[in-house]
């Protein structure tokens, strides 16, 4: 929010969702959005691409009838999306402020961006919290490679766990290594196709980012 703002609009939580290309960031957004809406949360979505708005178009198609397409905005960065969410987030800050102005009753904005390998982080001027997404197909050694995105993220998502047997990856090893490099910071294993771990991820977002009471599993309306 602009420091000079004196209006009474509520603070809309900004959540960055980053990770390597192909890790499943867009898929994560597509599966958690209907659950958030079902639980009474009003989301907005911003995606980042270099020279297109293809991710935004994909999300609009997938969430048609679930989320008004005007609440999904694509940003063409013209350069590495990594730069546009960390070193110079001005384009994304402008996009966020535009969405906040248009939809002031929203509860959260998800800002999706790819980045270089494991180095992507979000400027605190842009995101209040951020989720980093990796996938099993990258190999079980990925957590051991550290990287600021993987280590510092508020939540680490290890996605596409169904692919583990096909790429020779051990989920036990990945979990063990994740605990070593992240310490007490939370992580979760997910499968967007089956929904495994997705409700739990939404629980974490609501509890840790939105500070909303979360019902025990199985009690969601």
Curated annotation (Swiss-Prot):
Pfam families: cobW. GO terms for molecular function: GTP binding; GTPase activity; nickel cation binding. It is found in: Cytoplasm. GO terms for cellular component: cytoplasm. The keyword GTP-binding applies. SUPFAM superfamilies: P-loop containing nucleoside triphosphate hydrolases. GTP binds at residues 19-26. Keywords: Chaperone, Cytoplasm, GTP-binding, Nickel insertion, Nucleotide-binding. The keyword GTP-binding applies. Belongs to the SIMIBI class G3E GTPase family. UreG subfamily. This is Urease accessory protein UreG. It comes from Yersinia enterocolitica serotype O:8 / biotype 1B (strain NCTC 13174 / 8081).
């Amino acid at each position: 929010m602009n420091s000079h703002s004196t209006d009474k609009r509520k603070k809309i939580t900004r959540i960055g969702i980053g990770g390597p290309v192909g890790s499943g960031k867009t898929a994560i957004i597509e599966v958690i959005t209907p659950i958030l809406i079902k639980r009474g949360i009003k989301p907005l979505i911003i995606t980042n691409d270099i020279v297109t708005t293809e991710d935004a178009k994909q999300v609009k198609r997938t969430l048609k009838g679930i989320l008004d397409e005007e609440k999904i905005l694509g940003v063409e960065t013209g350069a590495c999306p990594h730069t546009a969410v960390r070193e110079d987030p001005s384009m994304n800050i402008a996009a966020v402020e535009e969405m906040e102005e248009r939809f002031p009753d929203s509860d959260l904005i998800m800002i999706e961006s790819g980045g270089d390998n494991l180095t992507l982080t979000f400027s605190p001027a842009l995101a209040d919290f951020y989720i980093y997404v990796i996938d099993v197909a990258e190999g079980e050694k990925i957590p051991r490679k550290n990287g600021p995105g993987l280590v510092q993220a508020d939540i680490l998502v290890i996605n596409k766990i169904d692919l583990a047997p096909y790429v020779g990856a051990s989920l036990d090893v990945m979990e063990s290594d994740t605990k070593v490099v992240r310490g007490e910071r939370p992580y979760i294993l997910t499968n967007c196709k089956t929904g495994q771990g997705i409700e739990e991820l939404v629980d974490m977002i609501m509890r840790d980012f939105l500070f909303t009471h979360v019902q025990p599993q199985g009690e969601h309306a």
